C-alpha cells in the first residue's frame, strides 16, 4: 500500500488524536501537540460528516476548554489550520483561539 506524504501526515494526526481522546476520557489534561492533534481530528471528521467550513470554525472554539489542557497551552495555540476534504473539494479550515 502506498501512502502519499499528505496521507501519512493525516494518519499521524489521527493516531495522536486518538491517544489524546483516551487521555481526555481518563480526565488527564492535554499538552500542546495532543490538543492540536485532537482539534485537527475534529475538523477532519466534521468535514467528512458534511459540515461546512463556517460551522467547523464556529464549533471549533467550543471543543476544548482551558480546564482540559495543561497550563499555558491555550496561550500557545492562537490558530489551528487543517486542510480537510469536503464533499465539494479540499478546503483550509482555520480555528482562531480554539481553546477558551
Swiss-Prot record:
Cellular component aspect of the GO annotation: cytoplasm
Pathway in which the depicted protein is active: Nitrogen metabolism; urea degradation; CO(2) and NH(3) from urea (urease route): step 1/1
- Name where it's found: Cytoplasm
The EC designation for this entry is 3.5.1.5
Write out the entry's keywords from A to Z.
Answer: Cytoplasm, Hydrolase
Give the InterPro entries listed for this entry: Urease_gamma, Urease_gamma/gamma-beta_su, Urease_gamma_sf, Urease_subunit
Gene3D superfamilies according to UniProt: Urease, gamma-like subunit
The record's catalysed reaction(s) read: urea + 2 H2O + H(+) = hydrogencarbonate + 2 NH4(+)
Q: How does it assemble?
A: Heterotrimer of UreA (gamma), UreB (beta) and UreC (alpha) subunits. Three heterotrimers associate to form the active enzyme.
Q: What is this protein called?
A: Urease subunit gamma
Organism annotation: Prochlorococcus marinus (strain NATL1A)
